[in-house]
A protein has these predicted regions:
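N-terminal amphipathic alpha-helix/helix-capping segment at the start of soluble metabolic enzymes
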Residues: 1-24, 90
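Hydrophobic faces of well-ordered beta-strands that scaffold small-molecule active sites
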Residues: 20-23, 54-56, 97-101, 164-166
Length: 207
């Protein structure tokens, strides 16, 4: 019996030849400003035939949420030309390319080194990589972050990606709102119900 892994799959408007996916892997090979380099392109070209669906490593939507020092950026329009080359490299052999959107929240180490603090759902004191404070986002800041996700998605589509993946695991900002450990809020994004804890993610998708 043929393996289901080898069966075609419909994904929205896209048809995939099989069900293999090249998962997001961070290479830390972009510039310090998050622009795509020749190394990024070479990496993607070498893997263009590996799976019909391919996902980039963490692309940050705003400097406040940058996860890796040399990760790709979707934070400004100036990044689009380089990202267009990346999308083309990933899709040169017929694959569909997604770009992973990331806000690192309390794990935004590059922002921490520049500012001395990071943001999350609620105030916290952390000791890694250095002792530091997590500041609580107010609702106006949350609305701004939702806008950053929407702008980043627009740039991704403009660059030629087939879609986006919203990174919502690994204690990054969206997951931090889902967790009652990191989310101690009492407002509409608060910890008292799953509906409230999931509100940020749902509003990002609606944006």
């Amino acid at each position: 019996m043929p393996s289901p892994l080898l069966s075609p799959l419909g994904l929205g408007a896209h048809s995939l030849a099989n069900r293999f996916v090249l998962s997001p892997m961070t290479t830390n090979s972009s510039t310090a400003q998050g622009h795509i380099t020749q190394e990024d392109l070479a990496y993607s070209r070498r893997r263009a035939q590996s799976a019909p669906l391919q996902i980039t490593g963490a692309a940050y939507i705003h400097a406040q949420g940058q996860l890796f020092e040399f990760g790709p950026s979707l934070a400004e329009d100036a990044c689009v030309p380089g990202l267009a080359k990346l999308a083309q490299a990933m899709q040169q052999d017929g694959a569909k390319a997604l770009i992973q959107l990331t806000h690192a929240g309390r794990f935004a180490e590059p922002y921490l080194r520049r500012q001395g603090y990071v943001y999350g759902p609620s105030p916290m004191t952390l000791n890694s990589p250095i002792p530091h404070q997590v500041k609580a986002l107010d609702q106006s800041q949350i609305k701004s972050i939702i806008g950053y996700y929407a702008d980043a998605t627009r740039r991704a589509i403009q660059a030629g990606f087939a879609g986006i993946e919203l990174s919502s695991a690994q204690r990054l900002l969206p997951q931090s709102f889902l967790s009652t450990f990191s989310n101690q809020r009492t407002d509409a994004y608060g910890a008292d119900s799953l509906e409230n804890r999931a509100r940020l993610i749902l509003e990002i998708w609606e944006a």
